[in-house]
Amino acid sequence: MELEFLGTCSGQPSKLRNVSSLALKLLDELNEIWLFDCGEATQHQILRTNIRLRKITKIFISHNHGDHIFGLPGLLSTRSFQGDVGPLTIYGPAGIEQFVKTSLRISKTKISYPIKFVTLEEGGKIVSERGFEVYTEKLDHRIDSWGFRMVEADKAGELLMDKLAEFKVPNGPLLGKLKRGEQVELADGTVLNGKDFLGPAKKGRVVTVIYDTRSTPSIRRLADHADVLVHEATFDASEGKLARDYYHSTCTQAAETASACHVGHLYLTHVSARYVGSLASQMVKQAREIFPATTLAKDLDKFVVPMKG
């Protein structure tokens, strides 16, 4: 499981940062990549990575402002040129289906694969498949904006081969059943319960993505004990009033959330283009005074989400 930041700037692209997009790479787990937002030129950023468009199976859209969706038509069109790419699902606010279909219709773009749209209307579980769940809640922005919490199912503990050695279980189906915690009967009639030979279960990982919003209680519900919190930080600590007036967050508000929610690591994104050089360093310093495990993400940064334990 790996995060790759494709765009980390707010509002409009700068020379150093493109607008919002984040790839959650689940290649080892599902052989899939999930995208969170798709601002202008996201597919250009992807050309600078090892991401293949055919691997993108889900796109989660936080809200319908242009810096978060203008890259969709081009990316969807280019994905059609990749051959048999399989279906894709887009989760987003009311209006995202109309935006995509209108853009494709007016440009006479034909898509070679099915696209399913899931309109976000209320908070709750929106994905449950193959050991992963995604939850969403509404945030506090000028238009409907949604945050996302991805939860990986717990992993079974490792088979304790030393403990099992005395029973001389042969390689094959019986070992597989024991690894799954099932009961088996050996050739001599001995009955073994797989649960007796498994180490402690490994907690699944949690990744929370929060784009445009003011501080609001739903963020903390989504971020509770997340391994990784990706949180917008449009402004630094000195611009609290500006952040509130424009329905955005400061770096210290993101850090306060990370601290209160006991997250593993905080990645700041959606940063105003004004924060470069010493101003960017100052922003990180402000956040780290509250939550030391903070990183100001840059375009094309990659971060592995480690397993617990």
UniProtKB/Swiss-Prot annotation:
It catalyses: Endonucleolytic cleavage of RNA, removing extra 3' nucleotides from tRNA precursor, generating 3' termini of tRNAs. A 3'-hydroxy group is left at the tRNA terminus and a 5'-phosphoryl group is left at the trailer molecule. The keyword Transferase does not apply. InterPro entries: Metallo-B-lactamas, RibonucZ/Hydroxyglut_hydro, RNase_Z/BN. Zn(2+) 2 binds at D67, H68, D212, H270. It holds the Pfam family Lactamase_B. GO terms for molecular function: 3'-tRNA processing endoribonuclease activity; zinc ion binding. Its cofactor is Zn(2+). HAMAP family: RNase_Z_BN. Homodimer. This is Ribonuclease Z.
